[in-house]
From Swiss-Prot:
Name of protein: Chalcone synthase 1
Biological process terms in GO annotation: flavonoid biosynthetic process; polyketide biosynthetic process
Location of the active site: C164
Similarity section: Belongs to the thiolase-like superfamily. Chalcone/stilbene synthases family.
Domain of life: Eukaryota
Keyword field contains Acyltransferase: yes
EC number, as in UniProt: 2.3.1.74
PROSITE patterns hit by this protein: CHALCONE_SYNTH (PS00441)
Pfam families membership: Chal_sti_synt_C, Chal_sti_synt_N
Function: The primary product of this enzyme is 4,2',4',6'-tetrahydroxychalcone (also termed naringenin-chalcone or chalcone) which can under specific conditions spontaneously isomerize into naringenin.
SUPFAM superfamilies recorded: Thiolase-like
Gene for this chain: CHS1
Amino acid sequence: MVTVNEFRKAQRAEGPATVLAIGTATPPNCVDQSAYADYYFRITNSEDKPELKEKFRRMCEKSMINTRYMHLTEDLLKQNPSFCEYMASSLDARQDIVVNEVPKLGKEAALRAIKEWGQPKSKITHLIFCTTSGVDMPGADFRLTKLLGLRPSVKRFMMYQQGCFAGGTVLRLAKDLAENNKNARVLVVCSEITVITFRGPNDTHLDSLVGQALFGDGAGAVIVGSDPVIGIEKPLFEIVSAAQTILPDSDGAIDGHLREVGLTFHLLKDVPGLISKNIRKSLVEAFKPLGISDWNSIFWIAHPGGPAILDQVETELSLKPEKLKSTRQVLRDYGNMSSACVLFILDEMRKASAKDGHRTTGEGLDWGVLFGFGPGLTVETVVLHSVPP
């Protein structure tokens, strides 16, 4: 008869959790950031606010975003005029859209990850689904399980309304699941649609306008598992460690509240400063055990909350401009997609590394960091180890 310890050991994987495949997806509707101020003030019937429009135009110009993708088209907004008002009761109509569209967009990203993985979807043992919107029962995890045709016994984890840091959270959870369950293959999906947050402008709430200038829609998916099957599964990044912390003196810096008008966001101006002055501590705690203290010697995947956050982190740590190349590229091409962003950046980095002939998926470097920043202020710090492409 085996002992409890022998049984527990047999249930666990031998190697570290590894990202085995990545997939991304966006809605087909692409928005040109340079023309967005005109479109936004026209569609929200706010042309009578020229000064506010010019403020918003400057926000769009300073965002360092070229394009975003949005499920909300002009036709859909005309069908739902309450979305275009600043504080009109509209939650039911928004909810009807997101409970269906969030899982659908997640399905597109998941199918691309599964295709790259090369294994039958019947081998998926766990599902983690993350989204900021569309709370329902059964949840988006249930809907995605049905849409993909996963086994009914798949073990599901649903994470609602975590916000922009959650791209790190899902990897932390996937790491624990993969390493503590032998042969586990975890499908992770982050799907974000701004239907729940879109609204017209208001002179007294400029923080709401900031969100209208930054946020876009997208879904990212990864397959995570330990002990890759040689010749079939190709590891991309090893997840070495993961930590979460609440920054000191940051209460109320980023808040989101679900109301009859949808999800409202409130931001303090000093969010970039709060993150940049605390980020070194998270880095030291994560990399001191590895003997690493040169932040230019690692590759970087940072949630692109906005250009000001990236600029101040870069300055605080004396990072070379190329360190945040992949992060800035995703911000430029997609905007801030909340939890999905870091998965897009993982994808961008491994593709760019292969294209540029680097020896690893992490721009030729062995070690790297993935940061998620969001409400709380909460910071997720994930240490990654790259592999040869």
